[in-house]
Curated annotation (Swiss-Prot):
Organism whose genome encodes this protein: Homo sapiens (Human)
Top-level lineage group: Eukaryota
Gene name tied to this protein: CALHM6
Protein name, as recorded: Calcium homeostasis modulator protein 6
One Pfam family of this chain: Ca_hom_mod
Complexes and interactors: Oligomerizes to form decameric and undecameric channels.
Listed GO CC annotations: immunological synapse; plasma membrane
């Protein structure tokens, strides 16, 4: 588990270099292995359709949910949201914008799974041959036994040669759908990235500086938090065995932790690179930084919430 966590931390730390290419390659490779080892079409009129759809869609759903679980923004949004101390979790619009961004990022792996599965064709062939609607369309103008033998096509057990030849048509349909899905995803991703960059309130070089600042801030925060926690633990253990009272340590309160753990919002009136930066520059100690007039969620700045003392959630 520790090795697995180290790999995840490495991916989070160097996500700009690794990008989503690693996720795509791992998903594609996993689908190919899964298809070759676990998938065996039953070649039954009753089971082909549900069996093919389950193998095509259920792993995609699992990957989508896993994308939510591994997103630091998900837990920033949800942690403490239902407690009485945080009855209000921000405006519905702001929350929906963040959820949309999280969903878009989480959709990469499942879309890759579906696209690679369609290019392979096995899942689609199995599901299509078990559909009565597909059977009517595919068997149009063929002999009467076509519909009955169609479920046997994925296993190469159809007696009529013209029926068995439908396997080539099904594979072609599946691969065309796969390439269409890939093209649509790339076009949407390109448009979304271009629009978010176009609407960015900060320049290209400032974004680079921003990411450098966040990396340094989180490294120093983790180092300081580890040092403070170690000293506090040593003091408490020492006092426990000696029966003495511990000396006072200035540890941030629950409210202060909640302030810097909230989702980042951009405000043109103040140039803050993180919620911690915003908190230490507040005008009054009792002033809340969670919601201020003019605060907005900027898609291109979503990376701010992806950083943390340990961005990989506890598994």
């Amino acid at each position: 588990m520790e090795k697995f966590r180290a790999v995840l931390d490495l991916h989070v730390k160097h996500h700009s270099a690794l990008g989503y290419g690693l996720v795509t390659l791992l998903t594609a490779g996993g689908e190919r292995i899964f298809s070759a080892v676990a998938f065996q079409c039953p070649c039954s009129a009753a089971w082909n359709l549900p069996y093919g759809l389950v193998f095509l869609l259920v792993p995609a759903l699992a990957l989508f949910l896993l994308g939510y679980v591994l997103s630091a923004r998900t837990w920033r949004l949800l942690t403490g949201c239902c407690s009485s101390a945080r009855a209000s979790c921000g405006s519905a619009l702001r929350g929906s914008l963040v959820c949309t961004q999280i969903s878009a990022a989480a959709a990469l792996a499942p879309l890759t799974w579906v696209a690679v599965a369609l290019l392979g064709g096995a899942f689609y062939e199995c599901a299509a041959t078990g559909s009565a609607a597909f059977a009517q369309r595919l068997c149009l103008g063929r002999n009467r036994s076509c519909a009955a033998e169609l479920p046997l096509v994925p296993c190469n057990q159809a007696k009529a040669s013209d029926v068995q030849d439908l396997l080539k048509d099904l594979k072609a349909q599946s691969q065309v759908l796969g390439w269409i899905l890939i093209a649509v995803v790339i076009i949407i991703l390109l448009i979304f990235t271009s629009v978010t960059r176009c609407l960015s309130p900060v320049s290209f070089l400032q974004l680079k500086f921003w990411k450098i600042y966040l990396e340094q801030e989180q490294q120093i925060l983790k180092s300081k938090a580890t040092e403070h926690a170690t000293e506090l633990a040593k003091e408490n253990i020492k006092c426990f065995f000696e029966g003495s009272h511990p000396k006072e340590y200035n540890t941030p309160s629950m409210k202060e932790w909640q302030q810097i753990s909230s989702l980042y919002t951009f405000n043109p009136k103040g140039q803050y690179y993180s919620m911690l930066h915003k908190y230490v520059n507040r005008k009054e100690k009792t002033h809340s930084i969670r919601s201020t007039e003019g605060d907005t969620v900027i898609p291109v700045l979503g990376f701010v919430d992806s950083s943390g003392i340990n961005s990989t959630p506890e598994l």
